[in-house]
Amino acid sequence: MARAVGIDLGTTNSVVSVLEGGEPTVITNAEGARTTPSVVAFAKNGEVLVGEVAKRQAVTNVDRTVRSVKRHMGTDWKINLDGKDFNPQQMSAFILQKLKRDAEAYLGEKVTDAVITVPAYFNDSERQATKEAGEIAGLNVLRIVNEPTAAALAYGLDKDDQTILVFDLGGGTFDVSLLEIGDGVVEVKATNGDNHLGGDDWDQRVVDYLVQQFKAGHGVDLAKDKMALQRLREAAEKAKIELSSSTETSINLPYITASAEGPLHLDEKLTRAQFQQLTADLLERCKTPFHNVIKDAGINLSEIDHVVLVGGSTRMPAVAELVKELTGGQDANKGVNPDEVVAIGAALQAGVLKGEVKDVLLLDVTPLSLGIETKGGIMTKLIERNTTIPTKRSEIFTTAEDNQPSVQIQVYQGEREIAAYNKKLGMFELTGLPPAPRGVPQIEVAFDIDANGIMHVTAKDLGTGKEQKMTVTGGSSLPKDEVDRMRQEAEQYADEDHRRREAAETRNQGEQLVYQTEKFLKDNEDKVPGEVKTEVEASIEELKAALKGESAEGDNTAEIRTATEKVAAVSQKLGQAMYADAQAAQAAGGAEGAAGGEHAKAADDDVVDAEIVDEDRKDGAA
């Protein structure tokens, strides 16, 4: 049987792991290291270099070296080299091929299957791109797994019931997840993150600082010199790492550039305090996803049993201190290597899928709510955010107009109550509905999300059996900034959304009452006394006028509500008048017939029957 590996395809570094005798082992690469830089370069002779060798030659081959390609996954980014365009999938495939070769050399056999990890907040197009990269590299991608989930799997497989917080700050992405572990089940309770926050951003702040200092001292802008910038990036990364263990570092780059006077050298000192000051706002950005996860999971900080730090960037003292502060003074677990834990978890999941690891269940979640637009522009959620996947949910909807021939199903993703403020994922139409009064047809809308997060939507007319399907290949296809916007707006405009929802619901109730009352008047024309009919019709006209007054977004909700209540109150007179007539008719019939105890009893029985009919009628109309 072909071996399956677990791959952590990182922004700055990648790791591959395999199960040996049921235990995960991190594979050493051809250069003897356990991590491989996620760098691809094209040598002048056309040879493709990957990993450490690509990183080493980057300074002298800037234009033909690609790094941090993970940040471009799922986009239309391209690089043209030697007259050929390369996309992110192809670049990532070069890295995956290198990891595959190293694994095959280590194991002495072919490797065809892999579980590849992605940030928890990766959208569907980014996940699809990662899967495609694996396929281009010649791998059968068994599953795309979220990085924090894989980390928890590696950490907690042998643990009793525990609640674990995974704080994952890598080279280019940031995720926080809260998971519950016990009896071989790893269940994600909530997840949040930022797809554009990572160690690269900390490096960039140091680069910007060095450029600024050099310009102030020498009047030369290094930002315009690609080769100098590459040297600065490498020096910045080295300085960042050194400042994790010491309080001061020297950045010395001789012959960084030249001016009319001759060669210029860069020599700067950077203290840990300066570094933390330069990057304070980046650290601040880590707080919101953390608070969102705690809020979404609905737990207290005291309920967190362990904190697991993942990603090389968590080695920065300021990050470790922030996590301790956020978790109420809890020390992070030191028993896991932040660089390797994700790949180990991926190898375990590969073992689960191949049947090598028994009695383990991994339950992941969808990061945002999914639903459809219903009357009044309301977002009706079928699947709430942080719902365990795979999942299937369905709900019965009906038509809003008489003899409606079709219904349009518009699928949205987000947290706002008004559909238009959420992300539209797709739309399709269910046609061929038979003519029927509004509210009669029954249309079942079903959402089905598979284990890879790809969503399928089905609409079925239960009357005719007609069905329409759509696959939303963007089950989570939202850029992180858009997710942030939705979340922030959901909080800022909660009151406004509530008002609009209330207005739409009040309007819907009013329209429904007009429809029902007019239908009742028409069906019982000969039984309703003239003066009662006139009064009811007048109140209906008032309600119609109120409904026409403004749109659902207007501020005449109170007016509509008052008119609706008036119609409801006046409508009661219809029933009273009809039953009064019925009783009078019964009484008259009893008097004309042979008067007797039996007839009187029968008349009483008829009255009782009328009450039961009334109950049924009310239930039917509800």
From Swiss-Prot:
Composition bias, Basic and acidic residues: 491-505
This protein's UniProt keywords: ATP-binding, Chaperone, Nucleotide-binding, Phosphoprotein, Stress response
Skewed-composition ranges (Acidic residues): 605-614
Keyword Phosphoprotein in record: yes
Region (Disordered) location: 465-484, 491-511, 589-622
Cited PROSITE patterns: HSP70_1, HSP70_2, HSP70_3
Key word Transit peptide present: no
Induction or repression: By stress conditions e.g. heat shock.
Taxonomy, superkingdom: Bacteria
Modified residues (Phosphothreonine): T173
Pfam families per UniProt: HSP70
Alphabetized GO MF terms: ATP binding; ATP-dependent protein folding chaperone; unfolded protein binding
PANTHER family, per the entry: HEAT SHOCK PROTEIN 70KDA (PTHR19375)
UniProt similarity note: Belongs to the heat shock protein 70 family.
Protein's job: Acts as a chaperone.
Name this protein carries in UniProt: Chaperone protein dnaK1
Lineage: Bacteria, Bacillati, Actinomycetota, Actinomycetes, Kitasatosporales
